[in-house]
Amino acid sequence: VNTNLLSRRGLLGAALGGAAALALGAPASASPRAHRPRVLVATNEPWGTYHVRPLLAEAARRGWRLTQLVPDLSAIAPGDPVPVATPADAPAADLLVVTGAGDWPADCAAHFRRLPLVASSLAYHQPVQAPRAAELRRRLRSITSSSPAESRAFARHLGTRRPIRVVGSPQTDDLPPRRPEADLVLVLTSVTHPDGTGGAAPGTELLLASAEKLAAAGKRILVGLHPREDRTLWERYEISEVPSVTASARAEVAVGIPGTVFPLVAAVGTPLVGCVDPALTVPDYLLAVCSSTIGDAGEAEAAVAGAALPEPAVLADAVGPVGGSARRLLDAWSRAIPAAH
């Protein structure tokens, strides 16, 4: 396994250059406008403030006000740093950002029908047109995504052939240096039980069984818990107190149900093994960053022993540009706001 983060970032940037230029069609950043925009955000996971949280520091630096739209306050944890409001109580705004064409973003777009609209992918989407995508398409001033691969899936989700600006993932703006600890395996969960915030991914039983096999083989298990996962399922192991991307810097290998975090963990330099239930459906690029995939817990030990990073071109396609992503994203939003309010 190549653990040289600096050389890998160089390869990542070099491999991405051509693809990013084609996807962007314009410079990735521009100077922020002099005014201080007020932005409403509606996510496919209505109470999923973890998608907006990585943007708060850049918004504060600019003096922007971000507010996430939620159906109600029932699922907002005390002390959550993301400002939230219902559509009825939302503050005046200059822009509405939707992270997909699910029911909640589409409902919010209909409610705020006079606001400029931008679509920004902050998590993976199935590459199939959403039933309500047509409600959004004509209004969209711009579209952004984290990576070239994600932009292809997002285009299909929205049912559009328009150019999509690739800005990178804000979660990669401050990647930790990789310092793997001997025999430490990071287990990346998904969500076992769907709730009002979002759906679930099959494969928890396979992942639990794989963790048991690895622990029995002498591996130390550290769990990177999805924000909506049932914590009680994993309490027999150490549960990371820091985000999974940060925790991955300690691990020799990560094993989990493929999801949005997979390319980000690979960007840190940690190889991935995907636990793939037959019922799991995810975009191909999330599988492409895996060293291998397993469908039986008995395969886990060998898969971990042989885990390696994907080729640089595959990694660049799935991860997008690293560093400055929150800045590029807010720059893109700024361009969609009329110069005069």
Predicted regions span which residues?
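N-terminal export signals
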Residues: 2-6, 10-30
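Short acidic-hydrophobic, aromatic-tinged amphipathic segments that line or gate anion-handling sites
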Residues: 83-86, 238-243, 290-299
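Donor nucleotide-activated moiety binding/catalytic core segment of transferases
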Residues: 227-268
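C-terminal segment of N-terminal export signals and the immediately downstream linker at the start
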Residues: 25-39, 341
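Conserved catalytic-core segment of nucleotide-activated headgroup transferases in glycan assembly
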Residues: 47-52, 58, 172-174, 180-233
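C-terminal amphipathic helix plus adjacent low-complexity
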Residues: 299-341
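Catalytic binding pocket for nucleotide-activated donors in carbohydrate/polymer assembly enzymes
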Residues: 261-317
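Active-site and donor-binding regions of nucleotide-sugar-utilizing enzymes
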Residues: 40-172
